[in-house]
């Protein structure tokens, strides 16, 4: 029973740490604001008639 408890706690710790490090990552897809705090509209809206950005 102790082994199961340790395994469950370790599994929870792994998932929580993945979640926290995912939030702290500097991925622009997860962080739609640029360095100045302005929303990067190119992430959400790409004009198909304008061509590649």
UniProtKB/Swiss-Prot annotation:
Transmembrane helix in keyword set: yes
InterPro entries recorded: PSII_PsbI, PSII_PsbI_sf
Record-annotated membrane-spanning stretches: 1-21
Keyword Membrane recorded: yes
Compartment(s) of residence: Plastid, Chloroplast thylakoid membrane
Pfam families per record: PsbI
This protein's GO CC annotations: chloroplast thylakoid membrane; photosystem II reaction center
GO BP: any one term: photosynthesis
Keywords: Chloroplast, Membrane, Photosynthesis, Photosystem II, Plastid, Reaction center, Thylakoid, Transmembrane, Transmembrane helix
Membrane topology: Single-pass membrane protein
Cited HAMAP family: PSII_PsbI
Function: One of the components of the core complex of photosystem II (PSII), required for its stability and/or assembly. PSII is a light-driven water:plastoquinone oxidoreductase that uses light energy to abstract electrons from H(2)O, generating O(2) and a proton gradient subsequently used for ATP formation. It consists of a core antenna complex that captures photons, and an electron transfer chain that converts photonic excitation into a charge separation.
UniProt subunit comment: PSII is composed of 1 copy each of membrane proteins PsbA, PsbB, PsbC, PsbD, PsbE, PsbF, PsbH, PsbI, PsbJ, PsbK, PsbL, PsbM, PsbT, PsbY, PsbZ, Psb30/Ycf12, at least 3 peripheral proteins of the oxygen-evolving complex and a large number of cofactors. It forms dimeric complexes.
Family: Belongs to the PsbI family.
Protein name in UniProt: Photosystem II reaction center protein I
Species lineage: Eukaryota, Discoba, Euglenozoa, Euglenida, Spirocuta
